[in-house]
């Protein structure tokens, strides 16, 4: 199973590299698109635009597949850990049976202590695995933070994404809130 885990992780890394190559190719196609537009070559521009879109989609597909393979690798890694814990617990149970037959109370106590430690380790690993699985299968970043970051990046580059995002805050609302707060502050200052 360790070999399969290695192969999964290796494949995921390869797909991530392919995704980056496709991103670079997309950027190159966009540069060619810009040059074609500047030269008035609209047929060429259309071809470069199609190529850029295809490369972008290919990059996203590679990234999605890499993410899915990472999730599978995480599950395989969990199975390997559980197999190890299960093997340890099986050995402890055998030791318990042997001690019970001999009725050696000291050995029974030692085996029970060891069993309890293994069981606690299993609980800790189960919680860790459950958290890791939740992180790989759900989106943990709140949507409002994602929208805010998109808006910030768009503003930095002078891009307009207000129409594309329904939840992006408008500057008028932010300005209104600022004006209201300023007025309240001024009134409080005047009272004192």
Curated annotation (Swiss-Prot):
InterPro entries: Snf7_fam. It is found in: Endosome membrane. GO terms for cellular component: cytoplasm; ESCRT III complex; late endosome; multivesicular body. Residues 164-192 are annotated as: Disordered. GO terms for biological process: endosome transport via multivesicular body sorting pathway; late endosome to vacuole transport; protein targeting to vacuole; protein transport. Keywords: Coiled coil, Endosome, Membrane, Protein transport, Transport. Residues 7-35, 102-125 form a coiled coil. Its main location: membrane. It is a peripheral membrane protein. Pfam families: Snf7. Probable peripherally associated component of the endosomal sorting required for transport complex III (ESCRT-III). Probable peripherally associated component of the endosomal sorting required for transport complex III (ESCRT-III) which is involved in multivesicular bodies (MVBs) formation and sorting of endosomal cargo proteins into MVBs. MVBs contain intraluminal vesicles (ILVs) that are generated by invagination and scission from the limiting membrane of the endosome and are delivered to lysosomes enabling degradation of membrane proteins. Belongs to the SNF7 family. This is Charged multivesicular body protein 1. It comes from Dictyostelium discoideum.
